[in-house]
């Protein structure tokens, strides 16, 4: 399979907020934020909580893992993860008549499918042919036998 390229993505840093009830020995793989890695007194921690609330974080979010919504073409956790998106033929075809007159003065807007280029700084897309055109080895063997 010489046509496949290995895609390399930057790992997104995961930041976990540690509650005061948990010890750091229980979860050694977690990345601590700079404010947590510094030794601080309880009074300073209260000031930090007030600052984080002012920045838009909810106070109850301090003890929970940050959750990001899934969009359908998510990257895996490992560096060897590949993203493959099959193109929809209907979206690739251009209209035969051309754009409508009122659309000439407006920016063309195309619906997003979740597999567009440019989703990240180093994203590369691997395009595959239409699955209907690709024959599997099982199909070839079945046709050669009478």
UniProtKB/Swiss-Prot annotation:
Chain positions found as Phosphoserine: 63, 105, 144
Keyword Phosphoprotein: yes
Tissue: Isolated from prostate cancer cell lines; expression associated with progression to androgen insensitive phenotype. Expressed in normal testis and at lower level in normal placenta.
InterPro entries (alphabetical): GAGE (IPR031320), GAGE_fam (IPR008625)
Composition-biased stretches (Acidic residues): 19-32
Region annotation Disordered: where it falls in the sequence: 16-146
UniProt keyword annotations, A-Z: Phosphoprotein
Compositional bias annotation for Basic and acidic residues: 79-92, 107-120
Additional free-text comment from the UniProt record: This gene belongs to a multigene family expressed in a large variety of tumors whereas in normal tissues, expression is restricted to germ cells. These genes organized in clustered repeats, have a high degree of predicted sequence identity, but differ by scattered single nucleotide substitution. Their sequences contain either the antigenic peptide YYWPRPRRY or YRPRPRRY which is recognized by cytotoxic T-cells.
Protein family: Belongs to the GAGE family.
Protein name: P antigen family member 1
């Amino acid at each position: 399979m010489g046509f496949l390229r290995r895609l390399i993505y930057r790992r997104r840093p995961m930041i976990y907020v540690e509650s005061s009830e948990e010890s750091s020995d229980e979860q050694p793989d977690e990345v601590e934020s700079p404010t947590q890695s510094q030794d601080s007194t309880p009074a300073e921690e209260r000031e930090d909580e007030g600052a984080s609330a002012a920045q838009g974080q909810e106070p109850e979010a301090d003890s929970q893992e940050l959750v990001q919504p899934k969009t359908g073409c998510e990257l895996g956790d490992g560096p060897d993860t590949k993203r493959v998106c099959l193109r929809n033929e209907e979206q690739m075809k251009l209209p035969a008549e051309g754009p409508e007159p009122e659309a000439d003065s407006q920016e063309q807007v195309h619906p997003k499918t979740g597999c567009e280029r440019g989703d990240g700084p180093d994203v590369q897309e691997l395009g595959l042919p239409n699955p209907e055109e690709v024959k599997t080895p099982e199909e070839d063997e079945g046709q050669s036998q009478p």
